Amino acid sequence: MIVKNLVLENYRNHTNTRILFSDRFNIFYGDNGQGKTNILEAIYLCASGRSHRTSRDSELIKFGCENFSIAVHVSKTGGLDKDIEISYYENQKKQIKINDIPIKKIGALMGNLYAVLFSPEDLFIVKQGPTERRRFVDITLSQIKPSYFYNLQQMSKILKQRNTLLKNISSNPKLMDTVDIWNMRLAEVAAAIIKARRTFSIMLSGMAENQHNFLTGKSEKISFDYRCSFQISGQDDTEQIEKLYLVQLEKSMQRDIVLGYTTVGPHRDDYDIMINDKSLKLYGSQGQQRSAVLSLKIAEIELVKKATNQYPVLLLDDVMSELDKNRQKYLMDSIKEVQTFITCTNKEHFGNLLSANSNFFKIVGGNIHSCM
């Protein structure tokens, strides 16, 4: 999968930016605050339907303007090319078109462009709480399996309804009669989410282990293990998981009523990232954590390729300066077949790491100052 070109209008600090890309490496360099990351963000937006930096589309509009637009042309291996357009007018709903055909739901965007983002903030996957690890998995799964994204949306809506119900039961006990309906709806989508997460984590863990063996010379063993918020076995199918979850919802009912929210379910899941069977978060050094995230990200690329028969595009946002020379070389050797977009402050930083098929773009104040 290749992004052939990008057009930005009134996006962040870009007024009218048009770029033709190399099929391999595209390096955007310049001082901080010039608009390099905005280019990667726009590509990511076309893959996922949302920014990785803000949940407010209004923040993407160039100051003093009323709207923004993004357009990319995507070429798929053995498939039809796709033109993706995203536009937003202030105080209106975001508009998305694929090959000039408007789509009403973001879920329909999934699968038209696969993108893996790697930034220094990805250390949060290790360092911070379950939300960051769930987000990491959910973003990738949503791209390769649009039905998963739909189930996440449904679960969010159902949880909101169920939680409202729980908060009002004490003042209106008759509402208890409707709880079972919401439990069944929740259990149905939750079971599908849980099964997908379990399968994904098994695949990712195996691929990350292989990558980590190369990176560390087999001196460390990494694992990425799914931890469901209630007990399931590896053999449980979707129907069995649904039944188990219904039992858990019944058991936690009184506690949920007291607290006013649903205390068990996929929204409370976590993943254990281990090095040599020890928690990476608790016991891993900074270097071990960086190596683990690097292995996970390369595994993510391989997993997307295995699931879709397409390499995703890779967005490296100010990552190279965070890696030592050995990790830099390992990363670049691992992505030779992947179209890659890189931001940095100094293009000389790469030395001989890049192939001849590389384009350099200097970004100054949202403008492409030079292209070599």
UniProtKB/Swiss-Prot annotation:
Keywords: ATP-binding, Cytoplasm, DNA damage, DNA repair, DNA replication, DNA-binding, Nucleotide-binding, SOS response. GO terms for biological process: DNA replication; DNA synthesis involved in DNA repair; double-strand break repair; SOS response. One of its GO terms (molecular function) is ATP binding. It comes from the Bacteria. GO terms for cellular component: cytoplasm. ATP binds at residues 30-37. The keyword Flavoprotein does not apply. HAMAP family: RecF. The RecF protein is involved in DNA metabolism; it is required for DNA replication and normal SOS inducibility. RecF binds preferentially to single-stranded, linear DNA. It also seems to bind ATP. This is DNA replication and repair protein RecF. It comes from Ruminiclostridium cellulolyticum (strain ATCC 35319 / DSM 5812 / JCM 6584 / H10) (Clostridium cellulolyticum). The lineage of its organism: Bacteria, Bacillati, Bacillota, Clostridia, Eubacteriales. The gene is recF.
